[in-house]
């Protein structure tokens, strides 16, 4: 039997993981000499472990999965510099008012928004309201908006900055690695992607959202949530499947591995506490 420590492992050396995680560190634009430490690096590591396990179970080759896990480790790079307090204020305010947080959802409501200009449209619509709420919409605050509604361009900027460092690490960066990182916010960008790229992108969305919905810290800071439940996690994934973002094979494999206990230790770490007996029974029945 596979031991807990060997389940859903990191496939790249710890030394490389440490180097990659350092790419999330960001110089504070308002306080010279201060570095904003990458937010929730452990979320990225847990997500990457889950992604590699699902990709392997779906038959992707070892070298591709290793390269994929590197992309998954960096999937939040477009949010390097996330200011927990400011980001939380802006997006909790938006959530209370049911304001879309993904570009596709924004354009569905605001159909006159030019593609790629969702951040600017958000600011035009809500700047005065946010400032009346006590949130000054400085250039730094605008970046916190861009981390969601302009994720593609912010990720591209950050990748341009760190690409030389990635190369020095001996990592070969392929275009598909950036593509899979964008799928949750920009599914349309993978409309003509190869099936295997699309599947890896789906896996990242499924695992990242599953971990995020189990993540106590992220729930408090990012989703304005006070409690983590497995029911909520899979309910959201099922919504994404109904929307065509996730496919049956990806969801089925995630359920099977979850039922087999592949992710128990990862999810308990994310929650900050052990599962109850009832929760563990629910996990074991996840495939049925």
Where are these regions (language model features)?
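Histidine- and acidic-residue-rich, metal-dependent catalytic cores
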Residues: 4-288
């Amino acid at each position: 039997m596979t031991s807990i420590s060997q389940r859903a492992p990191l496939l790249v050396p710890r030394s490389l993981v440490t180097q990659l995680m350092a790419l999330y560190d960001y110089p504070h634009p308002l306080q010279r000499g201060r570095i904003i430490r990458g937010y929730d690096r452990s979320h990225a590591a847990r997500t990457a472990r889950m992604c590699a396990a699902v990709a392997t179970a779906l038959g992707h080759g070892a070298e591709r999965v290793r390269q994929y896990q590197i992309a998954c480790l960096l999937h939040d790079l477009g949010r390097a510099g996330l200011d927990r307090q400011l980001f939380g204020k802006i997006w909790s305010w938006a959530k209370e008012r049911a304001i879309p947080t993904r570009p596709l959802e924004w354009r569905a409501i605001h159909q006159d928004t030019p593609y790629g200009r969702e951040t600017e449209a958000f600011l035009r619509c809500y700047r005065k309201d946010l400032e009346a709420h006590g949130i000054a919409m400085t250039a730094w605050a605008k970046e916190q908006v861009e981390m969601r509604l302009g994720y593609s361009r912010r990720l591209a900027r950050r990748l341009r900055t760190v690409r030389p460092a990635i190369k020095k690490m001996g990592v070969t960066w392929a275009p598909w690695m950036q593509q899979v990182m964008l799928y949750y916010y920009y599914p349309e960008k993978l409309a003509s992607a190869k099936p295997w790229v699309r599947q890896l992108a789906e896996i990242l969305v499924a695992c990242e959202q599953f971990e995020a919905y189990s993540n106590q810290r992220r729930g408090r800071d990012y989703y304005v949530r006070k409690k983590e439940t497995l029911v909520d996690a899979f309910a959201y994934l099922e919504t994404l499947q109904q929307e065509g973002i996730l496919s049956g094979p990806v969801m089925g494999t995630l359920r099977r591995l979850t039922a087999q206990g592949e992710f128990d230790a990862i999810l308990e770490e994310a929650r900050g506490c052990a599962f109850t007996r009832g929760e563990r029974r629910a996990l074991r029945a996840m495939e049925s």
